[in-house]
């Protein structure tokens, strides 16, 4: 959990033990992603359904990075073969069963409910999280663009058309695929 104040930052992880490195990596990278997104938010409230999806995908991307570079990590001296545990942890997350909440969301009211419950009901966004993770893997140099999302926020939705028109980048086009297609919003 990320706690911010005027002069300090505190991150609390809920891991059974600090040597469960895969979970520590996942949770810490998740909270650091929140921190970066909030630093670029201009004081605006976060768009929970979108931000949680981004941060979960980022955590998976960082797990992949640690798996690929484990030999370079000082922790590998304690357990050289732990890279396989990181890989399994990542695969288990990726292959999680998911609901269809975000994909089947058709109204602003449904999206507000889903957003409010987004931290608790993560399974409703797993499909979208995996899409974003795959986008991150295919376009790693463009990941930094996610910090711009608040500029294109329009209440509970993101104006991807404006973002795409301004950025003219395939990364934003791909990212827009996870946005619910609401009936009452153009």
Regions found by a protein language model. Give the residues of each.
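Post-HExxH zinc-binding segment in Zn-dependent metallohydrolases
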Residues: 47-95
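Short alpha-helical hairpin
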Residues: 1-8
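Short pre-active-site segment immediately N-terminal to the catalytic Zn-binding motif
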Residues: 10-28, 40-47
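Pan-zinc metallopeptidase signature
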Residues: 96-186
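Structured segments of extracytoplasmic/periplasmic soluble domains
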Residues: 35-39, 57-69, 134-139, 178-181, ...
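Hydrophobic (often cysteine-bearing) scaffold residues that line and stabilize catalytic clefts
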Residues: 25, 47, 51, 124, ...
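Active-site recognition of the HExxH zinc-binding catalytic motif
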Residues: 25-42, 52, 56, 60
């Amino acid at each position: 959990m990320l706690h911010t104040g005027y002069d300090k930052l505190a991150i609390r992880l809920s891991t059974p033990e600090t040597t469960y490195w895969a979970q520590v990596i996942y949770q810490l990278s998740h909270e650091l992603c929140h921190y970066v997104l909030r630093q670029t938010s201009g004081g605006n409230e976060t768009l929970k359904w979108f931000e949680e999806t981004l941060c979960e995908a980022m955590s998976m991307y960082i797990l992949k990075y640690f798996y690929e570079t484990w030999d370079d990590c000082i922790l590998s001296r304690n357990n050289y073969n732990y890279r396989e545990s990181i890989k399994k942890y990542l695969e288990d997350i990726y292959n999680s069963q998911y609901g269809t909440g975000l994909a089947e969301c058709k109204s602003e009211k449904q999206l507000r409910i889903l957003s409010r419950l987004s931290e608790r009901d993560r399974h409703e966004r797993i499909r979208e999280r995996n899409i974003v993770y795959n986008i991150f893997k295919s376009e790693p140099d463009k990941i930094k663009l996610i910090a711009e999302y608040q500029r294109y926020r329009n209440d509970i939705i993101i104006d991807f058309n404006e973002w795409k028109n301004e950025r003219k980048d395939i990364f934003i086009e791909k990212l827009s695929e996870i946005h619910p297609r609401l009936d009452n919003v153009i």
